[in-house]
Design a protein with these regions (language model features):
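Extracellular/virion structural assembly segments
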Residues: 1-24, 131-152, 156-350
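Tryptophan-rich substrate-binding surfaces of secreted polymer-degrading and adhesive proteins
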Residues: 1-144
Length: 350
């Protein structure tokens, strides 16, 4: 790797029903499994669970009769867990969860009362909004919350505009792949690393998870369809945020930059005993960015435009620690006939 890299900002595309054109993550309940029925390979069925939930399964082979999905892994593959759609005439128990889907809205609500019937989900004394459905959690712009399903996530996205960057944050898996329909672009990145400093650690330390990764060389075709896949073999695949957008170069990232975290945890002392209330933390990054002579006004305009705006930054594709979603902090752009170095602070969101 060289000593410098382009410093880019990415303006994330707004994700809508029209943009997310298909997904392997189930969202609504399906036909219930019946022990007396015979299923073909690819058939989808559900098994009811607690709190108005349903586990969704896919049949792995034909002539599939009387094999209970929950304990027949050679016959059924679990796709995920969903919750029943809210119905005003249904009586819900305390802690039951319902799904409410509207135009570009995919939300879950938890019942706050027993015998909960006929109360709209907008009644905050009866219902608590708990967030997006599992399929749409990766688009809620909250890095800590994850879409989680067994083995694999596949999202098909039709941007309808020029995009050249796909960024995955807080991802858990063995690999991530991005493919584009028009250009034939397809790239897979391994998400497990073994960064060690000596032979002892090489043999005895576990592989570590790469949690943040970007694909910054996607050919920008307006009519291209993107397929984003996270694979994790026989374990859960998870993704905190998926951002797709078009990057813009501000300048050149100079080395070295520094990164740390802002911790939101608190400590409490009771009778001399200190306990921690663990909360989320977020990246805090500081960069020196070389601005080409003559480009200062444009760099200033761009940084002003995206101040107090949520963006993705890519200071380098080689260091995951620099990849972040959040907002610009303090920055300044000096002017010089020979080019100058801008100081840019970035604060990530959780």
């Amino acid at each position: 790797m060289g000593s410098e890299s382009d410093f880019r900002i990415v303006r994330p595309l707004t994700m809508t029903d029209a943009v997310l054109t298909s997904s392997t993550v189930p969202e609504t309940t399906v036909t219930a499994w019946n022990s007396g029925s015979t299923y073909a390979a690819g058939d989808i069925r559900g098994v009811a669970g607690g709190n108005n939930s349903q586990d969704v399964y896919e049949s792995l082979q034909g002539s599939n009769t009387n094999h209970a999905p929950g304990n027949s892994p050679t016959w059924w593959k679990k796709l995920g867990t969903v919750y029943g759609t809210y119905a005003g005439g249904t009586t819900y128990a305390l802690d039951d969860i319902v799904t409410v889907i509207g135009p570009d809205s995919h939300l879950l609500y938890r019942s706050l009362a027993s015998g909960n019937i006929g109360n709209a989900v907008t009644d905050v004394t009866k219902w608590l909004e708990i967030g997006n459905t599992n399929r749409w959690l990766m688009f809620d712009k909250t890095v800590q919350t994850q879409t989680v399903v067994p083995r694999q996530i596949v999202q098909t996205i039709t941007p309808g505009q020029l995009v050249n960057t796909v960024t995955l944050l807080n991802v858990s898996g063995a690999s991530a792949t991005v493919a584009q329909s028009i250009s034939g672009y397809s790239k897979t990145k391994r998400l497990l690393r073994h960064d060690v400093m000596n032979w002892y650690d090489w043999y005895y330390e576990e592989l570590t998870q790469v949690t943040d990764v970007t694909f910054d060389d996607v050919p920008p075709y307006k009519d291209g369809v993107l397929t984003v896949t996270v694979d994790n073999n026989d374990s859960d695949a998870a993704l905190g945020c998926l951002f797709i957008g078009k990057s813009r170069t501000i300048g050149t990232t100079l080395w070295d930059f520094d990164g740390g975290i802002l911790s939101y945890s608190t400590a409490k002392e009771t009778l001399g005993v200190i306990t921690m209330n663990k909360r989320a933390n977020a990246k805090k990054l500081n960069f020196s960015v070389y601005i080409q002579p003559g480009y200062e006004s444009e760099a200033y305009r761009l940084l002003t435009q995206y101040t107090d705006v949520e963006i993705v930054i890519i200071p380098t594709a080689d260091y995951a620690m620099g990849l972040a979603y959040g907002f610009l902090g303090q920055w300044n752009v000096p002017v010089s006939n020979s080019g100058k170095t801008a100081s840019i602070e970035f604060r990530a969101l959780t």
